[in-house]
């Protein structure tokens, strides 16, 4: 297992990434603030989801990827040749996907799955407590406490997405990545998940990709505007969305392109 990286900042330095020889990300430099919601916005195809997947090395699953630069957690470069513990990395940097992806097992086992992989809370009583704690944290406990052994596939899509978030939380991450995590949900479920993120930032640093500017305006503390694989503007969300400095940002917010 890699050295302890807990409570250390996540920083991107001079990151360049190409797929099949085509540049996707160009000289990205970012520091993600602790215990804040960072929203990454920009037009379709600008590299938002690619950047998110690079942060926990899920981009490794894409063929013909070339990447250079640094993604630092504290003093450790997670894309360096010496970094190999991807299981531990993905525990610390969890991902909530665009579409809910519950595992084909019970609700209880979905929450417990990561703990078992990482050898956490090995006593049955401890695991029971963890499942209840994190189901409560995402507002699911009262809804499912009497059917924990039922298939997670029977949950509504909104419940499934909260369960996926719960699965990430149960292994005690430092960062939560969310890739369009509400785009497949109805408005009520979307609001529930948004409210959860706002509550969870007390204990986690949350990095979200969203195509919905309204969502970013509602919940972002910090904003990153990407365009054609480049960071155009970053800063406090109120400043970026209310008084942008860059002309491209102003045009994007005005709907000139999307």
Task: Locate the predicted segments by residue.
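Conserved ABC ATPase signature
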Residues: 149-155, 159
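ABC ATPase NBD coupling module
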Residues: 66, 77-94, 117, 240-244
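Conserved ABC ATPase "signature" region
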Residues: 70-77, 124-146
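Conserved catalytic motifs of ABC-family nucleotide-binding domains
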Residues: 172
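Helical segment within the ABC ATPase nucleotide-binding domain
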Residues: 190-202
């Amino acid at each position: 297992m890699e050295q302890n990286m807990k409570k250390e900042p996540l920083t991107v330095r001079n990151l360049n990434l190409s797929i099949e020889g085509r540049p996707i990300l160009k000289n990205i430099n970012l520091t993600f603030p602790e215990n804040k919601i960072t929203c990454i916005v920009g037009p379709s195809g600008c590299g938002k989801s690619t950047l998110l997947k690079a942060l926990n090395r899920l981009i490794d699953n894409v063929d013909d990827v070339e990447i250079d630069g640094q993604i630092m957690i504290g003093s450790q470069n997670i894309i360096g040749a010496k970094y190999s513990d991807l299981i531990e990395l993905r525990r610390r940097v969890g991902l909530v996907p665009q579409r809910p992806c519950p595992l084909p097992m019970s609700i209880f086992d979905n929450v417990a799955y990561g703990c078992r992989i990482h050898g956490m809370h090995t006593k049955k009583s401890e695991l029971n407590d963890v499942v209840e704690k994190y189901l409560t944290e995402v507002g699911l406990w009262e809804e499912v406490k009497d059917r924990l052994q039922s298939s997670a596939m029977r949950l509504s899509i909104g419940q499934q997405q909260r369960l996926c978030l719960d699965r990430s939380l149960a292994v005690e991450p430092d960062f939560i990545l969310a890739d369009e995590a509400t785009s497949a949900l109805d408005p009520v479920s979307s609001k529930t998940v948004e409210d959860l993120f706002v509550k969870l930032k007390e204990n986690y640093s949350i990095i979200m990709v969203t195509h919905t500017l309204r969502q970013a305006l509602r919940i972002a503390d910090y904003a990153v505007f990407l365009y054609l694989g480049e960071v155009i503007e970053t800063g406090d969300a109120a400043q970026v969305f209310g008084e942008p400095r860059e002309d491209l940002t102003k045009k994007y917010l005005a709907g000139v392109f999307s």
